[in-house]
Amino acid sequence: MGNPKAFLNIPRQEAGYRPIHERISDFGEVEQTLNSSERKLQASRCMDCGVPFCHWACPLGNRPPEFQDALSNGKWREAYEILTRTNDFPEFTGRVCPALCEKSCVLKLSIDSPVTIREDEAAIIEAAFREGYITAKQYKRNGLKVAVIGSGPAGLAAANQLNRRGYQVTVFEKDEYIGGLLRFGIPNFKLHKPVIDRRLKIMEDEGICFKTNSTIDLEHLPEGFDAYAICTGTPEARNLNIPGRELRGIHFAMEILAQQNRVLAGQTFSDEERITAKNKKVLVIGGGDTGSDCIGTANRQGAISVCQIEIMPKPPVGHNPATPWPQWPVVLKTSSSHEEGCTRRWSLTSNRFLGTEDGRVCGVEVEEVEWIPAADGGRPQMRPTGKKEIIEADLVLLAMGFLKPQLPGLPQNAVVAGDAATGPSLVVKCIAAGRRAAAEIDAMLQKGSH
């Protein structure tokens, strides 16, 4: 802790986003970066608290006070080494993590100005790549083989940890590229795909084998492996089964997001296959991060208008007494995509889709709802109000979350990790789950070898 009063004298400075008029014309990453000296100043704001709630809040158990201290003193390599003891892929979390740590920072409580932990993390790992700190290493092999099914953040973390422990790791991916959610679920304007490829090259050089276009039947796992890490994610989206669902122009969010990422990777689609918001009135049903990603994608594709509706009530602004510090605050969040242009509405349920004579969607009948608090403090009860209206839309994107998969019975040497085990969560939680799965497999196989 170089300057114990830095948090009093140095204000929080975020790198911010590229100008809206510039960024909506491309799919480049929207977030900017600070220079090295500014980043060191931001790191110096960390107070090295006696009880580091930032560490408590991080699913990975990252140690922000330690890497912030190194960074503030210009020890970039040391900061990188501290960071990667607990996080396999800071370049992913540094871009897309909601920064649970920052909401639990003591400076968030005291002056509502937490340390820029996520941005500092991203700066550290990018400096490590730039300076050549990250090179492929070779690990002594133990003669055992592990198959990882799925190449999202949980699968990649499990593979990375198992490989470092000496196992011969093969990763099976059903799609044509490695990355899972990182590759196809997160827009390029949040996570540039060469960032993934850069990491995959290192993992391949370290001995991990990747097999794409490999759909694995979990009831018939591939033979020849001593253990399996099942990291297949949550591929099934929550549907909206109301009248008119069969109309053309209604798509799951992942359909447009994955297709747009494939287009940016050079894949072509026929006019009939292509899902585009160009010159359309877009309605996004669902108020979470996936819905936000749909908004950003629709605006970049040239939508006439974008409206996002959410069945839940509008969250409080700034502070919510129901989720006090150091908990994750359930408050109104405005993403970079929201800033780019959309109408947001809450407490609306969808009753039916309306269509044209030729079978295309042209609107949605919605109804205002009220949420009645439960007497026992549990989930509030939804009550329709009878106030109905039509929202015009010729492209409807369903972003209402994903369903936890129902997995078949698995052999004792199989460990399930990530969203496949818990249902939909965060990239940071999936990386943590992949690391735990690797440790569990290692303990199981080492016990069996004695």
Regions found by a protein language model. Give the residues of each.
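Residues forming the flavin
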Residues: 1-37, 42, 121-450
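Short helix-capping and inter-helix turn/linker motifs at the boundaries of alpha-helical repeat units
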Residues: 57-58, 96, 341
